[in-house]
Amino acid sequence: MTRRDVLLAGLVAVIWGINFVAIHVSLEHYPPLLLASLRFLVLAIPTILFVPRPRVRRRWLVGYGIGFGILQFAFLYLGMAAGMPAGLSSLVLQASAPFTVLLAAVFLRERPGLPVLIGVAVALSGLAVIAGYRGLAVSVVPVVLVLAGALGWAIGNICSRQAKPDSPFRFMMWMTVVPPVPLLALSLVVEGPEQITWALADAPGAWAANVGLAYTVVLATIVGSGIWTTLLARNSASSVAPFSMLVPVAGLGSAWLILSERPSGWELFGGVLIVAGVLGPYASNRVNRIRARTSFTRLRRPVEKEGWVRSELSGIRHSLER
């Protein structure tokens, strides 16, 4: 990955980390499955009317919508509504990174290099430190739900990688057409018409929940997912996916500042390990490229010097012959 792509991946991590606070605020008013449906419905309508369809196979577009859209956010929102804290949700969802590396190895035959494997191991150790400190305070069901959402994200990553869209932005926008109807149907079955009607009727007065929904739609979905899809289109899935582990650092920090979910020293230590695990492979590749460039320069200088000597000797010989 280039330095620019690394910075973009880091920016997406910050946007998505803060998004967990926005989701927490929105869930105080909207039922989880209805909220997930509204998230994509707001984008699906203008997409159908104004955005040209991307040139990709339909199965990969639908697969991306099911994995990244339906599975990830249905389970994530249900888990947070069941009591999963915003900061801890941002942490557990990052299991999508090792899930993606595993799925890419099985289905795409992508073999991650040793630096990537070491980086994933270090980042996972950071996740384990934070989860070990905070996990005892959370019941099993919310954790399992958010982990299921992480698997959905990984499935979406693989479908996006296979699609290879000509326009990642159009691909991401058309993905939003897939989730609204299935999520709304699930909301009708699970949450019931009465709860949906009440939430929509009182929506104009729920300004905080609406601001959170707007953040989720504009920044987290359009900006964040658009950049993420672009990165997956021009880099291997195993290179991009580990950057999702930076999300809990931003998630824990924003939850601390806004929701007063104060991280402990162990959580901060785990965050440092996550950052090191994500950036380690990139730093290793940079060092290797610098070493290779230096070695090439050292090898080239004697050759250039030898060529100069030969040129001088040839000139002297021609002078003597004259």
Please tell me what each predicted stretch does:
Residues 26, 35, 79, 106-108, ...:
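Hydrophobic/aromatic residues within transmembrane alpha-helices
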Residues 17, 37, 41-45, 124, ...:
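Small-residue-rich packing faces within the transmembrane alpha-helices of Major Facilitator Superfamily
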Residues 43-47, 100-101, 137-199, 203, ...:
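Transmembrane alpha-helical segments that form core, pore/gating elements
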Residues 282-297:
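Membrane-interface capping segments at transmembrane-helix boundaries
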Residues 10-18, 22, 62-82, 103, ...:
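Hydrophobic alpha-helical transmembrane segments of multi-pass membrane transport proteins
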Residues 58-67, 112-123, 142-143, 166-176, ...:
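Cytoplasmic-side transmembrane-helix entry/capping segments in multi-pass membrane proteins
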Residues 1-5, 29-33, 37, 54-58, ...:
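Juxtamembrane helix-entry segments on the extracytoplasmic side of multipass membrane proteins
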Residues 41, 47, 103, 112-132, ...:
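Hydrophobic transmembrane alpha-helices of multi-pass small-molecule transport proteins
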